[in-house]
Curated annotation (Swiss-Prot):
Belongs to the short-chain dehydrogenases/reductases (SDR) family. CDD domains: ADH_SDR_c_like. PROSITE patterns: ADH_SHORT. GO terms for molecular function: oxidoreductase activity. Substrate binds at residue 139. GO terms for cellular component: cytoplasm. It comes from Drosophila immigrans (Fruit fly). NAD(+) binds at residues 11-34. This is Alcohol dehydrogenase-related 31 kDa protein. The lineage of its organism: Eukaryota, Metazoa, Ecdysozoa, Arthropoda, Hexapoda. The active site is at 152 (proton acceptor).
Amino acid sequence: MFDLTGKNVCYVADCGGIALETCKVLMTKNIAKLAMLYSVENPQAIAQLQAIKPSTQIFFWTYDVTMAREDMKQYFDEVMVQMDYIDVLINGATLCDEQNIDDTINTNLTGMMNTCATVLPYMDKQQLGKGGLIVNVTSVVGLDPSPVFCAYSASKFGVIGFTRSLADPLYYTQNGVAVMAVCCGPTKMFVDRQLTAFLSYGQPFVDRLRTAPCQSTTICAKNIVKAIECAVNGRIWIADKGELELVKLHWYWHMADQLVNYMHSTSEEKDED
């Protein structure tokens, strides 16, 4: 069980409802500090959060997840002045724009990877940190394909691949930073957006999404925090229809186990070979 009490949490996101609702739940967990790096400033939301737990310190920065990594470092240098250290980094920025592939990939995947690369030295127990947890909030269409949101699905598949790779014991045993992902099912706020299919053939299906059954952002947020509290390095969760389900991971490449064992073997063992 991962106890959030007294933890310093950094949440990188857009202005979507899941991020705000997740922060509301986090504020009930007696966290010490909350750093919010959002694409749009929302003073009313910050006031709502502060009212939940006045003793928790909240800091806010307007943050563009698609910025260059050197610019990100300047932001996180400021974050560290206020936070001292980061226990939990949550990556939640997301964009579904099938007509703008570059922005979709840069927001959902490239920006998330650059953020992780920027923040990891501050969390790495062999560098500036004391270990911690990275949580990548992604989508169920990163596990199964979406014929209508092809670019969005591809970016979310990338998040899963990056998460599983970064969670490898090769890193975790040295830096002490666990990495996990939560795949959210459709929420009402998502389907209410003006969405366009990758190809026009799929638009009728996109339009039907508006009346499809889906979960509330509030329920989804509660399950994201529940997954964090059950954190184990490398785990992937599904938060959908009000439920939280652990994904059963599988190796498809028949050489994968042999390659991983070779990578983790000692240099002495390799010399003997």
